[in-house]
Amino acid sequence: LVKTSLVLTQHLTTLRKNIAIVLQDVFLFSDTVFNNITLGDPSISLAQVIQAAKEVGAHDFISALPDQYHHKIGERGGTLSTGQRQLLAFIRAYVYQPALLILDEATSSVDTESELLIQRATEKLTAGRTSIVIAHRLSTIRKADRIIVMEKGTIIEQGTHEELLALGGHYKNLSDRQYFNQEA
């Protein structure tokens, strides 16, 4: 039993190091920006965090904070906007370089400016790795290799963005509505 627990623990540790999740509601500690990104991992340097922030497009907003990367943020990131909290979560995922990335509604409640930064960050972060992106905003998933459209837990369509538009089904209807809303 002890050996099984040890093996399971080792496997879980490896698994956890290879998966990063960016949720709709980002959890942040009442700590510095740096510590919220590294989660206290001493193997991640400030230089790595700064480089990741530049890649994600968040370096400018962090540099504008009073103590920059050492700025202490309030409980749950209360002193930051929703978009800024999302960007910190993207930097966190970026510095860990996971094999599997899961994005759950990462752009659902952010302003337009933050959404553009997050879309660029998504492109950089998903490049070269397996990614599962859960999104209602189709702009987030347009470049995906494969899009799965679900309704009430059932797959109803799948394909690339272009294939799904050509299909003329549910995805096309969603796309048309979102495009129309952007134009209005």
Predicted regions and their residues:
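A structural signal for short, well-ordered beta-strand elements
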Residues: L8, L46, E157-Q158
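ABC-family ATPase nucleotide-binding domain "signature/switch" substructure
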Residues: R16-D25, V33-N36, A52-A58, Q68-G168, ...
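Short adenine-binding "F-helix/F-box" segment of the Bergerat
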Residues: L12, L46, L167
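ABC ATPase nucleotide-binding domains
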Residues: D176-A184
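ABC-type ATPase nucleotide-binding domains, specifically the catalytic core motifs of the NBD
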Residues: T38-L46
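ABC ATPase NBD coupling module
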Residues: L6-A20
